[in-house]
Amino acid sequence: MLKKWIPSEPVIHIDDSDVVKPDGYKFESLGIVRDGSESTSSKNVYKKGYHVTEACVLTGNNHPVSIFSRIHSSAEKDYKSANTITFDAIEQGTTLFRKATFAMDRGYDDNKMFLKLDELGQEYVIRLTAKRKLLYHNKWTPATELRDRRKGKIKTSVFYKGKDHEAYLSHVKVQITASRKNIYLVLVYGITEHPMMLATNKEIKSKEDVIKVARTYFSRWKIEEYFRCKKQMFQFENFRVRKLCAINALNFYITLCMAFLAMISMESESNALKVAIIKTADPVKEKVFFCYYRLAKGISGILSYAKEGVRLWFRTKRPAYRQLCLKLVA
């Protein structure tokens, strides 16, 4: 069923989040994680909790559906590394879709990541850090130097942090440190203080291809919103079970609920069920880019009327009338 929802060229976003349990003591393999909700660009806040690695594929209407979700901790007995979990997520995406485009943030600017994606024959759009060096004209050159030499010549609009922005794009052919394979460095000017640097092995033949690469990366805000929706609408961090296996089981059930929201979101606007759900949610805005919140609120509102469960909502099928038959033995 999932493949029916996905376009012919799948885009998979991989990102890490956290589940913090600052007052927890008895949870299994409880480690220390960076609290993303309280940390800023200038200050990191660390608390007790777990790491969450998620891989989401975008549906035909650009809503995320999870294909991989795992809660893990560096305090586990046989824990290897966060990269091992990320590789599992990439392999899961490769198994489901023979070829896809993986979009990742700066935390995945790692030679091992590029080599893994090349090994599996996958395409990628990965944002580079300021420390990255690239081979340009047979000379190792800092990516920041290539960025500062150029100016964006391609004008386009992109959606970033809840707003539409005008961006100016440029691209240059380079080689990555890991595999020495030819890739493109796509530069995005006019949005952040320092222009963004995106590495991609996707083929670029026109300015439309450059715009497509940039928009593929900027669509990753949806996986960030996906995490927020899980935490707010399903109280993701408010679990009470202690075993890591049980925590992952609860995470699996939430993932199924989020997939159901994705299924409802793809229905037409005239669909009776979708209309009833949105009407119950009573949203402030008529249209939004991310509709999971209102769908979850609407379904919760409908189910709140079920005081004795939903079993009584269905008409019971009575068995066929059977006449009492007595067999007399002579």
Regions found by a protein language model. Name each.
Residues 1-60, 170-173:
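Active-site-proximal, Lys/Arg-enriched surface segment
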